[in-house]
Design a protein with these regions (language model features):
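Proline/Glycine/Serine-rich low-complexity intrinsically disordered segments
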Residues: 1-147
């Protein structure tokens, strides 16, 4: 998983992460994205560049809500996990995931569940094995899913 910038129709042109200097970015305070953006702001400060304006959004807003808002031009710049941005870009045609503007290094995510749950482990592992690595797509087309 990589944290990437997502833009839309109201977004400014961004050629590199440095172009985020002085820009407004909407983010939830509790998210890992906030930490990554704060780290980038410290770098900007050290380089004598203007910091990004980190505008906090309500904690009730999910990444999907914010991507929808970017798509209709209510928000200009957000940060989302790459897999989620790519998945939703297929549904929200006006958002633009920007893997070229990555705020984090690749990392892994995993499921955690109670020890001694063999049925849950089997179900989760079977489902995980049906998805191609590093994608949100099934390894083989699933009838009726349109994938």
């Amino acid at each position: 998983v990589v944290e990437i910038v997502v833009t839309g129709p109201a977004s400014p042109a961004l050629a590199s992460l440095e172009d985020l200097a002085g820009q407004e970015v909407h983010v939830r305070r509790s998210s890992s994205y906030y930490d990554s953006l704060s780290r980038l702001n410290r770098r900007f400060r050290g380089l004598g560049k203007p910091e990004m304006k980190l505008t906090l959004v309500p904690e009730a807003l999910e990444d999907e809500d914010m991507m929808d808002m970017v798509g209709v031009g209510l928000l200009k710049i957000i940060v989302v996990d790459d897999w989620k941005a790519e998945l939703w870009a297929g549904l929200l045609s006006k958002i633009k995931p920007r893997p070229d503007l990555a705020l984090s290094e690749p990392s892994d995510i995993a499921w955690a569940f109670r020890k001694g749950s063999p049925k849950l482990a089997h179900m989760r592992n079977t489902e995980s094995n049906a998805v191609a690595p590093n994608t949100c797509r099934p390894k083989r087309p699933q009838p009726g899913l349109g994938l």
